[in-house]
Amino acid sequence: MSTASVMDLVRDDLRAFAGYASARTSALQGDVWLNANESAWGNPADPDASTRRYPDPQPKGLRAALAQLYGCAPEQLLIGRGSDEAIDLLVRGLCVPERDAVVVTPPVFGMYAVCARLQNAPLVEVPLVDGADGLHADVPAIVQAALDAKAKLVFLCSPSNPAGSAIPLAEIEAALQALQGKAVVVVDEAYGEFSDVPSAIGLLARYDNLAVLRTLSKAHALAAARIGSLIANAELIALLRRCQAPYPVPTPCAVMAEQALSAPALAVTQRRVTEIRAERARLHAALVQVAGVRQVYPSQGNFLLVRFDDAEAAFQALLEAGVVVRDQRAVPRLSDALRITIGTPDQNDRVLGALQRKQEAA
């Protein structure tokens, strides 16, 4: 598909949109900077005055490091405030209110629907299928729903939150082929580091209607830094960058993130991912033996979705043990479920101990 075709999916009124040109976007040179109305002095809380100036909108060093990490070109990557900002930019950039639909696969991460509703974009739901192999996406049904609704965006969460299932790469490619020139397929790989399924990023060379979301919040343990990446066609990235707020990446967060992508830090992250995967298998095997546990779904993420005979009792037993998990009971089709993040071995033992004591006391 030609580069122009993905841009045909962008809102007509935004294709020539220039956005806001901040003081940091100009390529001027000097040693006295008086162009952004910043303070000439640092704050007492900032002894080296490193935060008195506005940050680079897309820090070059961090952008290059993220591109290397994910295997794309820097111009194909946009840094944002977590994946949430990227989701919002995609919906606002592609969807005309009351016309262009967004396809989601509940139960799934709620921000896709939130952003669609804020844009007043029609929301099309294609529920996950609850089968013997877990809750999984019905990709042919998703594609058909997108075609029927003339959707502009299709969100595929892989691994899915909270279901834990991943979509095979061949099925993602089939969706991209079927929706070429019709919709952008957004693959949310927030939990990709924990998965056996390869990243969809490699498909970008053949399909410019692909967008991939990645984050440093999960495997890289930088949730508070809010460093998310949108990886997509370079022309689409340039357009969405013009739609983005002027200074999305605070300097302290960018510095920390770049340090986290050094070789020694990445080696630590990989060791922890390996440990989490091992603990995920151990906790899964142990939970299925606990009385009152109805089902433990297989997971490609750093969490397990668990159904209980009495989810309220399980939730309260964990709280009494000082363990806070995600209550899923208000989510349609998950009225008996809790989502449990994989913690340290000791933390996972506390989960098991609390649930086992609950059953012994029953």
From Swiss-Prot:
Similarity comment text for this entry: Belongs to the class-II pyridoxal-phosphate-dependent aminotransferase family. Histidinol-phosphate aminotransferase subfamily.
Catalytic activity annotation: L-histidinol phosphate + 2-oxoglutarate = 3-(imidazol-4-yl)-2-oxopropyl phosphate + L-glutamate
Pathway assigned to this chain's UniProt record: Amino-acid biosynthesis; L-histidine biosynthesis; L-histidine from 5-phospho-alpha-D-ribose 1-diphosphate: step 7/9
N6-(pyridoxal phosphate)lysine modifications at: 218
Cofactor: pyridoxal 5'-phosphate
InterPro entries on file: Aminotransferase_I/II_large, HisP_aminotrans, PyrdxlP-dep_Trfase, PyrdxlP-dep_Trfase_major, PyrdxlP-dep_Trfase_small
Protein name: Histidinol-phosphate aminotransferase
HAMAP family reported for this sequence: HisC_aminotrans_2
Top EC class, one word: transferase
Single Gene Ontology MF annotation: histidinol-phosphate transaminase activity
UniProt EC number: 2.6.1.9
Domain of life the protein comes from: Bacteria
GO biological process: L-histidine biosynthetic process
Keywords assigned by UniProt, alphabetized: Amino-acid biosynthesis, Aminotransferase, Histidine biosynthesis, Pyridoxal phosphate, Transferase
PANTHER family assigned to the protein according to its UniProt record, in alphabetical order: HISTIDINOL-PHOSPHATE AMINOTRANSFERASE, HISTIDINOL-PHOSPHATE AMINOTRANSFERASE-RELATED
Assembly, per entry: Homodimer.
Organism ancestry: Bacteria, Pseudomonadati, Pseudomonadota, Gammaproteobacteria, Lysobacterales
